[in-house]
Amino acid sequence: MTNVVETIKKQINEVVKNSISKAVQNGELPQFTVDELFIEIPKEKGHGDFSTNIAMQAAKTVRKAPRQVAEIIIKNMDLSNTYIDRVEAAGPGFINFFLTNAWLYDVLKVIQKEKENYGNLDIGRGQKVMVEFVSANPTGPLHMGNARGGALGDCIASVLEKAGYDVTREFYINDAGNQIEKFGISLEARYIQLLKGEDAVEFPEDGYHGEDIIDHMKAYIEENGDNLLYVDSEERRKTLVEYALPKNIERIRKSLENYGVVFDVWFSEQSLYDNGEVRETLDILKEKGYTFEKDGAVWFKASALGAEKDEVIVRNNGIPTYFAADIAYHRNKFLKRKFDRVINLLGADHHGHAARMKCALKAFDIDPDKLDIVIFQLVRLYRNGEIARMSKRTGRAISLDDLLEEVGRDAARFFFNTKASGSHLDFDLDLAVKKSNENPVYYVQYAYARSCSMLRLLESEGFKVPDVDSVDLTVLKAPEEIELMKKLSEYPEEIRISAQTLEPSRLTRYVLDVASNFHSFYNACRVKGEEENLMYARMILVDSTRLVIKNVLDVLSITAPEKM
């Protein structure tokens, strides 16, 4: 797809390198190598449309003041056949490029021709990428950490798809290990209590105390009566887990679907034990000399591969640890299913996980750089200016379902992606339901609805958005028009950086800026009633803004209402 900003950066790169070659040839600069030219969009309007710090980078090598180097480079530039209007040296040695408006008109042409494909990139080149996220314990409802991880992971996956990767969304079901054992004990206790009274058995202090455990057992008793009351405890727990666990998983699936998160694969941890992959993984580690025994347990020699400490992979009771299954799971991802890259999203309590898992990959000759681990921080909910811990509906800890009922899917997904994953997030529940410009998601959706309304009104009077090549766009030169076009031009670059940094929070900030620029344009520039060519040019600008806002909201999986 066409990326006008990328074209301009290539032009600047070519102009600067040719200028340096010319300056070297005529003896103004000594011979030196330019490895990579860093080109950015300045934050200050007066600093031009694009800027580079090449003069400051080269100053030490060429033994001249950065400002002098900048002036020599500028003096030797040939700007013909480029979008560049003029170039200035600024500050300690920045080189600032000011462009003609022609590039902005070309941006509108690209948007009008590519429509929903605007911003699509090919940096992924079809590489197979797995994004594994949420992966909550299937022992209860989804909490706020799962909610943030869900919005973040799904948007990362969408950004990567937009950037040209072949993405698989995966949920790892933790259906083996301690939490399932505890789940079975909790179910058994509630089952017996419901049939024989609360005093019949003590509920485990570290068990799952949620109402859903009681609900499951009431439903089981209604269907099956006391058929398990007098069977062996192990068999009873197994049967109750087999009854309740699929219901919990289905509930999680429905909650996530209501949230706009749909997984391609639901992968069972237990399947790694059932098909022998955990055993095979442990055997290979032993054969390679990466295990040792100590205190009756089997340890992984992670320290031999760069970790700070070794890790237990089989407890002294002979049961593999969660980490052992996780190593097997990552072997499955890379060696059996052959993903080129894997991205795991984990809560802040998994901070030490990245280093040890990368060491485990090294043990199997898998490039550890193929694994990215995104750690996201905690969420605090606020209501009436105070931390909200309980659901207004249930009186229990706020679940994802409670949040969706209170603020809706759009607000939840937008708010969870307003901060970088590594930052703590304060979620204002009152703000999320406000129908005013204070509410960021409302502000963006209103800009989209306004653009649709403007075009709908004009169409009702016989004016349709024309073919972009039939209109003279050079009439678009009001400051608000220029700023809006510049902002629209940045979208492909925002996708590129978001894909490289795995930070979709860039997109919420970006679309807020687009909405702000559009509202400024709306207040300053009339469309209906203007001279015909200007009216049609502005219609193209309105429609291009509509397309970009819709495009971003689609990536964020947030609805774009045509009326509000």
From Swiss-Prot:
<comment type="similarity">
    <text>Belongs to the class-I aminoacyl-tRNA synthetase family.</text>
</comment>
<dbReference type="Pfam" id="PF05746">
    <property type="entry name" value="DALR_1"/>
</dbReference>
<dbReference type="InterPro" id="IPR001412">
    <property type="entry name" value="aa-tRNA-synth_I_CS"/>
</dbReference>
<keyword id="KW-0547">Nucleotide-binding</keyword>
<dbReference type="InterPro" id="IPR035684">
    <property type="entry name" value="ArgRS_core"/>
</dbReference>
<keyword id="KW-0030">Aminoacyl-tRNA synthetase</keyword>
<protein>
    <recommendedName>
        <fullName>Arginine--tRNA ligase</fullName>
        <ecNumber>6.1.1.19</ecNumber>
    </recommendedName>
</protein>
<dbReference type="GO" id="GO:0005737">
    <property type="term" value="C:cytoplasm"/>
</dbReference>
<dbReference type="Pfam" id="PF03485">
    <property type="entry name" value="Arg_tRNA_synt_N"/>
</dbReference>
<feature type="short sequence motif" description="'HIGH' region">
    <location>
        <begin position="136"/>
        <end position="146"/>
    </location>
</feature>
<dbReference type="GO" id="GO:0006420">
    <property type="term" value="P:arginyl-tRNA aminoacylation"/>
</dbReference>
<keyword id="KW-0067">ATP-binding</keyword>
<keyword id="KW-0963">Cytoplasm</keyword>
<dbReference type="InterPro" id="IPR001278">
    <property type="entry name" value="Arg-tRNA-ligase"/>
</dbReference>
<dbReference type="InterPro" id="IPR008909">
    <property type="entry name" value="DALR_anticod-bd"/>
</dbReference>
<dbReference type="InterPro" id="IPR009080">
    <property type="entry name" value="tRNAsynth_Ia_anticodon-bd"/>
</dbReference>
<dbReference type="Pfam" id="PF00750">
    <property type="entry name" value="tRNA-synt_1d"/>
</dbReference>
<dbReference type="InterPro" id="IPR036695">
    <property type="entry name" value="Arg-tRNA-synth_N_sf"/>
</dbReference>
<dbReference type="GO" id="GO:0005524">
    <property type="term" value="F:ATP binding"/>
</dbReference>
<keyword id="KW-0648">Protein biosynthesis</keyword>
<comment type="subunit">
    <text>Monomer.</text>
</comment>
<keyword id="KW-0436">Ligase</keyword>
<dbReference type="GO" id="GO:0004814">
    <property type="term" value="F:arginine-tRNA ligase activity"/>
</dbReference>
<dbReference type="InterPro" id="IPR005148">
    <property type="entry name" value="Arg-tRNA-synth_N"/>
</dbReference>
<dbReference type="InterPro" id="IPR014729">
    <property type="entry name" value="Rossmann-like_a/b/a_fold"/>
</dbReference>
